[in-house]
A protein has these predicted regions:
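Short, active-site-adjacent cap segments at secondary-structure transitions
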Residues: 71-75, 123, 145, 230-233
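Amphipathic alpha-helical segments at domain termini/boundaries
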Residues: 2-28, 32, 175, 180-217, ...
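Crotonase-fold acyl-CoA enzyme core
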Residues: 108-220
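N-terminal pre-core extensions flanking Radical SAM catalytic domains
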Residues: 238-239, 246
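Conserved CoA-thioester-binding segment of acyl-CoA-metabolizing enzymes
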Residues: 2-69
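Terminal peptide-recognition signature
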Residues: 29, 33, 48, 66, ...
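An acidic, glycine-rich surface segment that forms the CoA-thioester-binding/catalytic face
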Residues: 45, 49, 53-57, 79-119, ...
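A secondary-structure boundary/capping signal
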Residues: 67-69, 75-78, 132, 140
């Protein structure tokens, strides 16, 4: 699934599954279905693409923080909706097959630095947002689990992309064990999936805001160039020519 081009739609259109907020130079994209553990239904999928585009094109926003409302960060596709809505199932299957789902910052081609602030359980498709963030911090009570295999599904993009952040064996173990094992925030930090643990958990938003403001002190052009240089190497690899490392073309 390749990186796309940012899109934006009128900010007057209300969000029903997300909260889009701004605090100084930091924009916040908050999953807002706490009663459903922030699972993604068809409406949220559509809103995510619009929200990423809106924040990326806002000149006042230098850094974007992604987090969840309530006790969960993000728990992937709303299985209940998919099970009860044949049209939603067909559409999700088609977009997955055709690689046209655009719900993370990477999918939507966001140029600005993105911080994932994992505030609770991150499960299944929620791992996409960890894999595709530039920086990941987590509350001390955050957990990570990949239940796909436990419900007869195969891990796809999220497992592959998550392996860019940490040991392949750890990703494979999580994929094979499924819902029977949860990775703690401490373990995720030890393996390199997370760069900071926040304790107490209630301090997560403040710490993410501070980190965002620190990053925002750098010129936006430099931030975008640095981000794209790093991601381009991860996507395309490097080639050694005349004793120097360059991104492959």
């Amino acid at each position: 699934m390749g990186r796309g081009t940012p899109v934006v739609s009128p900010t007057t259109t209300p969000y029903t599954r997300l909260r889009v907020e701004r605090e100084g130079p930091v924009g916040w994209l908050v999953f807002d279905r706490p009663d459903a553990a922030n699972a993604m239904d068809a409406v949220m999928f559509d809103e995510l693409e619009r929200a990423w585009g809106e924040l990326d094109l806002d000149a006042e926003v230098r850094v974007i923080v992604n987090t969840g409302a309530g006790k969960a960060f993000q728990t992937g596709v709303d299985v209940a909706q998919v099970a009860n809505d044949r049209d939603a199932l067909r559409e999700h299957s088609r977009r997955t097959r055709d690689a046209t789902l655009r719900f993370t910052a990477w999918h939507c081609g966001v140029h600005k630095p993105v911080i994932a602030a994992v505030n609770g359980v991150c499960a299944g498709g929620g791992l996409h947002f960890v894999a595709d963030a530039d920086v990941v911090i987590a509350s001390s009570n955050a957990t990570f689990v990949d239940p796909h295999v436990s419900i007869g599904q195969v891990v796809a993009y999220e497992g592959i992309t998550l392996a860019r952040k940490g040991p392949v064996e750890s990703v494979m173990r999580m994929a094979l064990v499924g819902r029977h094992e949860r990775m703690t925030a401490a373990r995720a930090y030890q393996l390199g999936f997370v760069s900071q643990i926040v304790d107490p958990p209630e301090r997560l938003r403040a710490e993410a805001q501070t980190l965002g403001e620190t990053i925002a002190q750098t010129a936006p052009e430099a931030l975008a160039a640095m981000k794209h240089a790093m991601w381009d190497v991860l996507e395309e690899g490097t080639t050694e020519e005349e004793g120097t490392w360059t991104t492959s073309t």
